Amino acid sequence: MMWPSACATAAELVGLAVTDPLRLEWTGPRPMGIGVSAASADLVRQRQQRVAADIAKAGELFATRCRAANVQHRITEETGDPFEIAADLVRYHDMCVFGLRGLFEHDVVPEPRDALERLVSQGVRPILAVGERYRPIRRVLVAYSGSLESAKTFKHFVHSGLYADAPVRVVHFGDDAQVAARRLEKAAAFFAAHGRVVETDHEGGSADHDLLSYAEAWKADLIVAGNSAKNLLLRRVFGETALRLIRESPLPLYLAQ
């Protein structure tokens, strides 16, 4: 997914491989008995070997794909807490790309929702969460609630320059047509000021429940989504819409709360 954008901007892609020793060494409560420690040590050794082999394989695949696309690239291998490492590295990179259904392999992170929430709470943003299979981005749907965080998200997206040739639609959910018209007009003006013409749409109902079906009906390839203000207070980082998308969306997500 990132190859076309990287080629267009001459960007460098950095592949991050993280080994978490604490996770690999955890074997659960151990009963007392002869041979238990040896068995646990053997299990840890097997895990370490498997992870090392998988990292090497993934790194070679990443490098091969980058070379084929003529994209600058390098691989960084780190040891430690994946969240702390990601939070540190994001200071020196423009964007983080993670899997939509799992950020790290080998069961390092059990829940994608909690993992993304923790990453964003530590300042890892923007995040492009993608599926397992490559999907060309031909149509981009921006969900705009009118909140400050929602506006920040689409502003991040515009400034990134991603998918500049893809048609963009900004949709607002809610029952107040006048409020929707005002917000959509201002959002469209921001896009226009940065050289991007967008179409807008107002839908009744709620983004929490209707955004995914709307995106699929419009045949969107990417959803740009932020928060609602009330849910920001309740969830601190993610609103209900973002959490629902992370759990259920079959489409790639651009998140920058």
Explain the meaning of each model-derived region.
Residues 23-25, 83, 107, 137, ...:
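Generic structural signal for helix capping and beta-alpha/helix-loop junctions
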